[in-house]
Structure formats: C-alpha cells, structure tokens
C-alpha cells in the first residue's frame, strides 16, 4: 500500500514516525529529478517542500536538546576571556567549593567531586561547570571527578551524541553553505527556520568532525575555535537577517540569535537577546536558556530569581522546579534541593532525576530504608541498569536486608556497561566485606576494582588501610601516595598517609600530608588534632 502513496506524503509519514533516514532517502529521490538540489525551486512547490523536509530530517537525526546537554571543553575552560570575581561572597558562586552551612551530610559521609561539590544522585553534564585552575587538574581522571571532568572539546560532543552515519555523504553535503544567498532565504520565514536549524545543528557536526582530525595531528586549539566561529557565524547571519525582515517582532529568531551567541561564548550578548525575546513572548525554553547564561557567568542567585519569575508565569512547571533544585544542589544546599525535588515529584511522579536525587540524599543522611523505597520505585518504572542495582545493594546492606544484598550486586555486575562501572560495584562489595568482617574478601574486591579501573583512588586508599592492618607499612604508604596523586580533593588518603608517617616518626611528611587533608576538609576533627600534636612536637625541638 505504501508504494501507491504520493512520495511527498510518504516522506512526511516517515518523518512523523521518526524514520528520518528513510525520509531523507525518499526526498533525495524526489530532488534528483531537478538538476540542482542545492536550492529549492520556487516554481515547483513539491520540490521546495521536499527540500525543506529533507533538511528537517537531516537536522532531526543529529538534533540535541541544548537546554540539558551542556559540556565545557578544556579549550573553552582554559581560553575563556570572561572576567569573573575571584573572591565572591559565600553562597553566590558555583566556581568555588561551597561550604556546608545547611545541615546536610558532611564530606566525611558524602563524597565530593573534583569541583568540590557533593556527588549527585543523577549524572548530568551540567555538573561540569566547576572550572579547574590548571590544565593538569582539568585532564586528571579520578573516579569521583567523572562528573566534573571536561572533555577535549565541547564541539566534539555533537559528533558523539549525534548520528554518526550522517557525518559523511557519498554525494557530498546536502547544502553548500558558501553558495547560499542568506538575504534571499531570510525573506521566506518557513524556509529560513528549517535552513537555520540545519546549519546550526547538522552542519556544525560535519565541520567539527573534519576539524578534530586537524586538532589530533597538530594539537592546536585556535583552529578549532576559528572554524567553530565560522559555522556559528553562518547561522548567526541568517538569524540576524530574518530578525530584521520580521521587523524585530519574532521572538523565535531572537532566541536563535541568543543560542548562537551562547555557543560562541558571548554571554552578555546572549543575555540581551533572551531578555528581549521574553519581553515579546514568555516561553519556558527561553527562561531555561537565560538561566544557562547566568550559570555560565557564575551568577546562580540571579538564575534562581529568574527560575522563580518563570514559576510565577508557569506555576508548577517541572523543568523550572528541577532547574532550581539543580542549582541548590550545586551550591551544596541539600535541604533546599530536596524540597524542590519533592515539588517536582508532586507535579510528575515519574521524574527519574528527582527520585534518584531524593533517594541519594536519604542514603547519605543515614536513612537507607527510605532511600530503598525510592530506588525500588525506579525499578518499578522499568529502569534496569547496573547503577540502580548497585544502589539497591548498598541500601539493602545498610538497611540490614542481607538476603537481597549480594543478589543486587550480582545483577549490577552482569549489567555493568564498562570497566568503570564494574570497578564501582567491586569497590562497594569490598565495603560489604569490611562490614561483615571478612578482610580477605575485602582485599580481593578492592584488587578487582583496581583491575577494572587502575585510577580508582578510593580502592587504593582502602587497600592501603588493609595493608596497614597486616603490618605492610611501606606498601600502604605507596598505595596512599598513589591515591592522593589521583584524587587530591579527597581528604582520606592525605590523613591516612599523615597518620602512618607520624607513627613511623616521619614528622615532616606527616605535617605536609595533614595540611593537605585540612585543605581538602577543614572541619575534619582528627586532622586538626594531628596538626596540633605535630606542632607541639616541632615546638619542643
């Protein structure tokens, strides 16, 4: 029956059913009848419709929702020219590790990332906004910093998240951007919008994949930035001309100009465009884009106020509530974050991020039974992965439901997608073994964690403690030095190394390590006692 359908109608049907490759192939066959399919023929409406539909299909194949996906590359971090206050007031910055003043679990209970924030219950790219101070810190890869580690280039993410099959075409690119007369297209609003999205989403992918080869061979970042600017400039020119043609009354084009400015790192210009768009038409997406700008400018309080303004216009909007909760979580205000995540669940009781974050908060607040209820809820919703079963196993163990503990960890090991996940499961199994007093099993589990991931700093630290209990002092010191070099933001390796050095009489190294421990966790009482004791020793010399 499909062969009897009108080709354009069939292509539109493929597009509506998200069969974008079939849609693009059918549109290509229709356009082959025209000698040049680079531009739509205004005299043939069918060709023009097929051209627009193919552009939209190619765009959808690599489309990424930029509201949630936001990753800063090393080049963007280290070459950023935006001036941000180096000594902001407490509670007003995301770039500095937040002080725990809200009654949440301390660093001794809840681990932190390299950026200085507590580990969240839900992995999301936006947690990468904590900027490292040096290039060495930026490329370091400890496990707990996976949520704060930058990738090589932010433009490279479009290739990995998009559809790889569309990066190359046997007949060359669908549209030759250098031959387009953008002024002519800007006078046709529907055509211009489809063309803009194609340039912004699809062509950026094609250009960056060629450029990554240049960066790989030459290792030069300016090439990447220059070509990236060129692509966004095409989209920006089209958006500017279309805005001018609409007499500056079309809010959609202002949002697109703001997106171009944001991707180019021109945050103040993006802010102006988003604000202008909000004056004309208040949309949830515009609030979210503008909040992203304020987060990039390290103004979380302004972003919070903006979200609350959005809630006045759109009461109960889940994305706005979730945005507030994320910012509170990044500012280490766990109690406020949990309250807003609960508000999210009142509006959408299947919101995975809210359920996971509330469950994580209960677990680290010494309430594993309540956390278990939230993780079981995720299991009932159909989520079936290694991370969930790993969390279920830990909750069952600490809630003293031992019959389900090992079964959950077995499922987690079988569902682990990579070696890093398997290493985390073995590490947690080592904790279970320590809890039941089987040090030999714990030793083997920590070893297996290191076999799967030799950058697992926590496993090195715990293995060193077990070696110290066996009396292997030098081996324990070596393991602790490895752990502290892999994860300098963790206080445990520094404190353990200081304690061992103090016991064997190496007071100088003990004092240096204790100072590092205090810098990582200023409220650690045992570190403060050790430093006080060492200073008394030095005063007596």
Swiss-Prot record:
Pfam families: TPR_16, TPR_8. It is found in: Cytoplasm, Cytoskeleton, Microtubule organizing center, Centrosome; Cell projection, Cilium membrane; Cytoplasm; Cytoplasm, Cytoskeleton, Microtubule organizing center, Centrosome, Centriolar satellite. CDD domains: TTC8_N. InterPro entries: BBS8, TPR-like_helical_dom_sf, TPR_rpt. Gene3D superfamilies: Tetratricopeptide repeat domain. GO terms for biological process: axon guidance; camera-type eye photoreceptor cell differentiation; cilium assembly; establishment of anatomical structure orientation; establishment of epithelial cell apical/basal polarity; establishment of planar polarity; fat cell differentiation; inner ear receptor cell stereocilium organization. The keyword Manganese does not apply. TPR repeats lie at residues 14-47, 251-284, 285-317, 318-351, 352-385, 386-419, 423-456, 457-490. Its main location: cytoplasm. It comes from the Eukaryota. GO terms for cellular component: BBSome; centriolar satellite; centrosome; ciliary basal body; ciliary membrane; cilium; cytosol; fibrillar center. Part of BBSome complex, that contains BBS1, BBS2, BBS4, BBS5, BBS7, BBS8/TTC8, BBS9 and BBIP10. Interacts with PCM1. Interacts with CCDC28B. Interacts with PKD1. It is linked to Retinitis pigmentosa 51: A retinal dystrophy belonging to the group of pigmentary retinopathies. Retinitis pigmentosa is characterized by retinal pigment deposits visible on fundus examination and primary loss of rod photoreceptor cells followed by secondary loss of cone photoreceptors. Patients typically have night vision blindness and loss of midperipheral visual field. As their condition progresses, they lose their far peripheral visual field and eventually central vision as well. This is Tetratricopeptide repeat protein 8. It comes from Homo sapiens. The gene is TTC8.
């Amino acid at each position: 029956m499909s062969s009897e359908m009108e080709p354009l109608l069939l292509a539109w049907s493929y597009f509506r059913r998200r069969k974008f490759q079939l849609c693009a192939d059918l549109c290509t066959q229709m356009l082959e009848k025209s000698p040049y399919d680079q531009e739509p023929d205004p005299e043939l409406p069918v060709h023009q419709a097929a051209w627009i539909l193919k552009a939209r299909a190619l765009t959808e194949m690599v489309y990424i929702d930029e509201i949630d996906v936001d990753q800063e590359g090393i080049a963007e971090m280290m070459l950023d020219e935006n001036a941000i206050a180096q000594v902001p007031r407490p509670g007003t910055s995301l770039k500095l590790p937040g002080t725990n003043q809200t009654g949440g679990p301390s660093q001794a209970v809840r681990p932190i990332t390299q950026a200085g924030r507590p580990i969240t219950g839900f992995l999301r790219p936006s947690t990468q906004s904590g900027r490292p101070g040096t290039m060495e810190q930026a490329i370091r890869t400890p496990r707990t910093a996976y949520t704060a580690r930058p990738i090589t280039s932010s433009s490279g993410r479009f290739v990995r998240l998009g559809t790889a099959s569309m990066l190359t075409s046997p007949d060359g690119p669908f549209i030759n951007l250098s031959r387009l007369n953008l002024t002519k297209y800007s006078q046709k609003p529907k055509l211009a919008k489809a063309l803009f999205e194609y340039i912004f989403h699809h062509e950026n992918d094609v250009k960056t994949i060629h450029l990554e080869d240049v960066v790989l061979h030459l290792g030069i970042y300016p090439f990447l930035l220059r070509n990236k600017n060129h692509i966004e400039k095409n989209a920006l020119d089209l958006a500017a001309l279309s805005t001018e043609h609409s007499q500056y009354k079309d809010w959609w084009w202002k949002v697109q100009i703001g997106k171009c400015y944001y991707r180019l790192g021109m945050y103040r210009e993006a802010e102006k465009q988003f604000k202008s768009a909000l004056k004309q038409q208040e949309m949830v997406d515009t609030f979210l884009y503008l909040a992203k700008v304020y987060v990039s400018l390290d103004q979380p309080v302004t972003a919070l106020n903006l979200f609350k303004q959005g809630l006045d216009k759109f009461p109960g909007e889940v994305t706005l509530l979730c945005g507030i909760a994320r910012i509170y979580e990044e500012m280490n205000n766990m109690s406020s974050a949990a309250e807003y995540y609960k508000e999210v669940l009142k509006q959408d009781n299947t919101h995975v991020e809210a359920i996971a974050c509330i469950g994580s908060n209960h677990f680290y607040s010494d309430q594993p039974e309540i956390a278990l209820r939230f993780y079981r809820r995720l299991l009932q919703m159909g989520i079936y992965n290694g991370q969930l079963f790993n969390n279920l196993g830990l909750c069952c163990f600490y809630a003293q439901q031992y019959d389900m503990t090992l079964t959950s960890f077995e499922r987690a090991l079988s569902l682990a997608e990579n070696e890093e996940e398997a290493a985390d499961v073995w590490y947690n199994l080592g904790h279970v073994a320590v809890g039941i007093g089987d040090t030999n099993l714990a030793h083997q589990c920590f070893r297996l964690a290191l076999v799967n991931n030799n950058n697992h700093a926590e496993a090195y630290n715990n293995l060193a403690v077990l070696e110290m209990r066996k009396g292997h002092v030098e081996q324990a010191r070596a393991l602790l030095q490895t752990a502290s070099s892999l994860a300098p933001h963790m206080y445990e390796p520094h404190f353990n190394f200081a304690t061992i050095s103090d016991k064997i009489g190496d007071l100088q190294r003990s004092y240096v390590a204790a100072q590092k421990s205090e810098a990582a966790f200023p409220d650690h009482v045992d570190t403060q006692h050790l430093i006080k004791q060492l200073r008394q020793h030095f005063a007596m010399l």
